[in-house]
Amino acid sequence: DGECGGFWWKCGSGKPACCPKYVCSPKWGLCNFPMP
């Protein structure tokens, strides 16, 4: 359906993948900007 997770959306098991500019932060289980 093309849905993706925006900033600070819950991500991980059973959740939509984060939008391309975000990554799923394992620490918080939320979509966040990639950390350097």
From Swiss-Prot:
Annotated keywords: Disulfide bond, Ion channel impairing toxin, Knottin, Potassium channel impairing toxin, Secreted, Toxin, Voltage-gated potassium channel impairing toxin
Expression sites by tissue: Expressed by the venom gland.
Disulfide cysteine pairs (residue numbers): C4-C19, C11-C24, C18-C31
Pfam families xref list: Toxin_12 (PF07740)
One Gene Ontology cellular component: extracellular region
MF GO annotations: ion channel inhibitor activity; potassium channel regulator activity; toxin activity
InterPro entries named among the record's database cross-references: Huwentoxin-1
Keyword Disulfide bond: yes
Subcellular location: Secreted
Domain of life: Eukaryota
Function (record text): Gating modifier of Kv2.1/KCNB1, Kv2.2/KCNB2 and Kv4.3/KCND3 channels.
Additional information: Blockers of Kv2.1/KCNB1 potassium channels may be a useful approach to the design of novel therapeutic agents for the treatment of type 2 diabetes.
Record's comment describing the protein's domains: The presence of a 'disulfide through disulfide knot' structurally defines this protein as a knottin.
Entry's family note: Belongs to the neurotoxin 10 (Hwtx-1) family. 44 (Jztx-4) subfamily.
Listed name of the protein: Kappa-theraphotoxin-Pg1b
Species of the source: Chilobrachys guangxiensis
